[in-house]
Amino acid sequence: MPKHEQYFDYVKINLASPERIRQWGERILKNGEIVGKITKPETINYRTLKPEMDGLFCEKIFGPVKDWECHCGKYKSIFYRGVICERCGVEITESQVRRHRMGYIELAAPVTHIWYLKGIPSYISILLNKKVKEIEQVVYFNAYVVLNPGKSDLLNYGVILTEDDEKWPYIEEKLYTKELMDVELGIGAEAIQRLLSDLDLQAEAKTIREILISNSDKKKNTQKRAKLIKKLRIINNFIATKAKPEWMILSLIPVIPPDLRPMVQLDGGRFATSDLNDLYRRVINRNNRLLRLQEVFAPEIVVRNEKRILQEAVDALIDNGRRGRIVVGAKNRPLKSLSDIIEGKQGRFRQNLLGKRVDYSGRSVIVVGLQLKLYQCGLPWEMAIELFQPFVIHRLIHQGLVNNIKAAKKLIQSNDPIIRDILEEVIQNHPVLLNRAPTLHRLSIQAFEPILVEGRAIQLHPLVCPAFNADFDGDQMAVHVPLSLEAQTEARLLMLASNNLLSPATGQPIVTPSQDMVLGCYYLTVDNLKNQKGKGSYFINSEDVLIAYEQQRIDLHSYIWVRFDTFSFDDILEEKNIQQVLYKREIDEFGTVIKVYNTRRIREDKDGFCLTQYIITTAGRVLFNKVVQKALIMEI
């Protein structure tokens, strides 16, 4: 069969009407027969290993198990495509249709959709202005609701009545007398459906808006205002999507295609099946039992109990464990419901739809790149040659080094020295994207200029770690190569790490020293009285200090005197509120004054002009000052 690509802009998820659910599952065959309704809980016949008719794997409803072959075996060829078998009623088509054809279960009694009853917020309770517990009592047959108060002064429309209510004995006694003859009480999901269908959304929205406008003092009744706003928002959503509130009560259950809930035969004749099949089977069994009880006019208390059990079975199918006991399978393992399949990290959306495998991407552990600039990352040679292979092959052919792709790949596999030079040319001005999961904000994906490095770890500048919320204790990051020129331009202009210095959430700098960098700065500038090697030595400039440190004549933390004539330290000392203590004052034979303080030594002439100035510091602080000064000069 020809395959047609379907293009779409977005996926819209909203409430489905009973007619829409029936439309999903129901089909009219060429012979006029309507199929789609599942009435039997059976899956496959244990003798023939073929699907049971009208069961959860029915070939008439969902399509043939084998391509171009019907259930009974009368037709076994593509030649009969589209033919409906006279014996079994199966359409001759591809087995692939079992991945998208749906069925439905028609319920003997309406049930509440648990997402809208027990979800946060509870849509049903907000629309009906009731507590969730009250709605729950009605749904699970523990309380009544007044659907029509009639002429009674005791009752009001929508009031919840339980057997513990003080009015209940009187109402129960007089319910079928003339006094309360026109009073109508309801119980179960049918009663909630009736209340929801009686709602006039347009009128409700108008009333709420008038209340909100008239209530000018916003400080009073803040909680009441918030409830009204929440209700108005829900009503507006229903109006905008053209959905009706009573659709939150289900009368039809859609059954997903059988190939999405498969049953697989294992070695030894046993079968492994999806948990959904067990949950669907529970619903069908209880639904069929309720139908039989209704047919034989069973007592109301028995029918109500069966309706409650059906409600619980549907709850378990939609969201197992949301309410009541968790339905378990073999070895007390909770069965995976539809919600469990959809939600969470391993769910359908995050795992299969958003988390797809990507070409031209790699993944490795991150380590510190000491020599890197902020906008650079160290890319391992092995990873780079794989990611940029198409560009390398193109360059090899373009330069005439090889004639075809096969020869180029052979040259790459042989690790020819020319490949490294070609790769260096290719990655120049070609940014790569680095992503660290979880991608919580836009700074979790940034662009960097790759630098080829040895080893197998990706090297990263430590200043960009706060943006990625990364550290170097085994974190992994993914690399992606933007292929098109437009993608490369966008990566360079918008996503380069040096262009993302501020947090989009707060506006505060996000490129801040942290962890190892802070520890290193602290270690360079800290006092350490144990390291006394070269203590008290004099140096003419900072270069001499660093040479002496490299020659191990002084320790990193030894206090030394360094000549520093550039400017006076008085302003800095005042700003830092550092007290100067004059230890000694001498006048030499030339009349120059030598002042020795706790932080510096000054030599002044007769007029008080500073001739030389030595400050007390350490080799670590000199090194720190030099690095910071160099970085500032480079930025300027």
UniProtKB/Swiss-Prot annotation:
Chain residues that bind Zn(2+): 70, 72, 85, 88
Annotated catalysed reactions: RNA(n) + a ribonucleoside 5'-triphosphate = RNA(n+1) + diphosphate
InterPro entries: DNA-dir_RpoC1_gamma (IPR012755), DNA-dir_RpoC_beta_prime (IPR045867), RNA_pol_asu (IPR000722), RNA_pol_N (IPR006592), RNA_pol_Rpb1_1 (IPR007080), RNA_pol_Rpb1_3 (IPR007066), RNA_pol_Rpb1_3_sf (IPR042102), RNA_pol_Rpb1_clamp_domain (IPR044893)
Keyword Transport tagged: no
Documented EC number(s): 2.7.7.6
Localization in the cell: Plastid, Cyanelle
GO biological process per UniProt: DNA-templated transcription
Annotated Gene Ontology cellular component terms: cyanelle; DNA-directed RNA polymerase complex; mitochondrion
Its biological purpose: DNA-dependent RNA polymerase catalyzes the transcription of DNA into RNA using the four ribonucleoside triphosphates as substrates.
Name of the protein described by the UniProt record: DNA-directed RNA polymerase subunit beta'
Organism: Cyanophora paradoxa
Lineage: Eukaryota, Glaucocystophyceae, Cyanophoraceae, Cyanophora
